[in-house]
Amino acid sequence: SAPSSAGPAVSHDSPDIPDSPDPQLTLARGDQPEIDLEIKRSHFLARAQRADCEEEARAFIAAVRSRYPDARHPCSAYIVPSPGAPPIERSSDDGEPSGTAGQPMLETLRSSGLTATAVVVTRYFGGTLLGTGGLVRAYSEATTRVLAAAKRVRLTTRYLWEAQIPVADAGRVEAELRAASERGAHDLSVEDTTWGATHAVLALTTDSPDATRITEILAAITAGGAAPRSAGHRVVELPA
């Protein structure tokens, strides 16, 4: 018999459908939406999860398969990034008639604009045959609903910088940087301040890898007494 329903899906506005997957639009890390779609007594249990690579997508599919070991058809689809190449797209009908499950799921996932995302739809047969068209509609609808229940985020790269400031000036410099950022004068954020005996190191982030603008900002505040040093970058999640 089918497991109990996962409960009502949480509704989120759907974004405009782009011509191709947005490489920055995905699911929030840790979000695992789940829905139960019942059609003619068959249950289609859909789950989705962030997957940044094929290994993560396959591990998620295996975990869902283990969760429902008595299910007949855990069908799947995923789109994951491939550095320097087009995204990797895979789907599986897992025993359903060819083209009735995995491919419709993949097409639905593709049209959502999401990437780095895996979906598994597990069917528990209710005794009534749905036919080829019915299966296509059911797997497509289950995928649509679970993606609608997901928390979407847009990934953006923040570039890290450090600036060494004399202790006597560090408090003022930090305050001026924060105030200017709050006014929208620049996108430079103060993430942390490490205090030493004679100097403090400000950990800063910005949207640009170019040091020109941040150098100008620091020069104006410190009378040319501080220059930024690159400290790498990180990817952060912003609400989509």
Regions from the language model: what does each represent?
Residues 1-99, 193, 208-211, 216, ...:
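C-terminal regulatory domains involved in ligand/effector binding and gene-expression control
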Residues 11-12, 177, 187-212:
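Non-DNA-binding regulatory cores of transcription-related proteins
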Residues 34-39, 149-154, 187-195:
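Short, flexible, solvent-exposed loop/turn segments with mixed acidic/basic and small polar residues
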Residues 49-52, 163-167, 203-208:
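Short beta-strand-to-loop capping motifs
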Residues 67, 108, 120, 173-180, ...:
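Generic non-transmembrane alpha-helical segments
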Residues 101-149:
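Active-site beta-strand/loop microenvironment that shapes enzyme catalytic pockets
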Residues 153-169:
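Short glycine-/aliphatic-rich beta-strand segments at the starts of folded cytosolic domains
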Residues 165-190, 213-215:
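Short amphipathic alpha-helix segments
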